[in-house]
Amino acid sequence: MLVHGAWADTSSWDGEVSALMQLGYSVRAVANPLENLTTDSEYVSAFLDTIPGPIVLVGHSYGGSVITNAAAGNPNVEALVYVDAAAPAVGETNGSFSGADSVLKRKPEDELFDKLPYPGAPPGAVELYLRKDVFLDHFGNDLPAEVATRLWATQRAASTSAFETPSRFAAWETIPSWYFISSGDQIITATSERAMAERAGSHVTVFDGGSHLTLISHPEAVTDVIEQAIDSVRQ
């Protein structure tokens, strides 16, 4: 099962879904609400409860925080795959993992996001949309400009609450994990991802180059790592 990240939707997994289906696997990509880590994780957890095991659970970006929580206590989840993703420990927030060298830390918020209020928001929370120049130059910078522009135009907003909610679980402590790290990721940087992967004891694959959207630009490379996790479950 595949869980997308912020400023994206299930279509970000199109390449992986097609490849895995062609290989004969049952695949689902769930719509991540992008509202609050606790409720987003509960939503994905409820979806997981409808799927027979064994399950390989894959998360991209903020989706990594979601799978870290959603998999907790589910015996059918036998492997976790983090794709340019966050893997928080209990009490940590997704927003703390971009890395000091991330563009999210190097630019002021007003240069990164367009902010919009939304109905039912927790006090102080707003929805964030990545600005066009940030999306094209730093988020999906290895994609053709036409593709990146289309993805920017169709991005799903993420609430600030999603990034500020502390993680309640750390499923990687008990479930084997794999980590796909793009050396060219400017959002959750390779330095930060390597530290999380080492802490989790993950099997690590480093992709030379790419961006935060390597899952779209090079789905075959990401699929290879997902297959490694699948193979471990089948042994």
Feature names for model-found ranges:
Residues 150-171:
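Active-site nucleophile elbow and catalytic-triad environment of alpha/beta-hydrolase enzymes
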Residues 1-37, 55, 73-76:
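Conserved HGGG/HGGXW glycine-rich cap/lid loop of the alpha/beta-hydrolase fold
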Residues 39-55:
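Conserved acidic catalytic loop of the alpha/beta-hydrolase fold
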Residues 183-210, 216, 228:
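Conserved loop-alpha-helix segment in the C-terminal half of the alpha/beta-hydrolase fold
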Residues 216-232:
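Post-His helix in hydrolase/transferase enzymes
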Residues 58-63, 67:
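Gly/Ala-rich beta-loop-alpha elbow adjacent to hydrolase catalytic centers
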Residues 179-181:
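Short beta-strand/loop motif that positions the catalytic acidic residue
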Residues 76-77, 81-123, 159:
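Flexible "cap/lid" loop of the alpha/beta hydrolase fold
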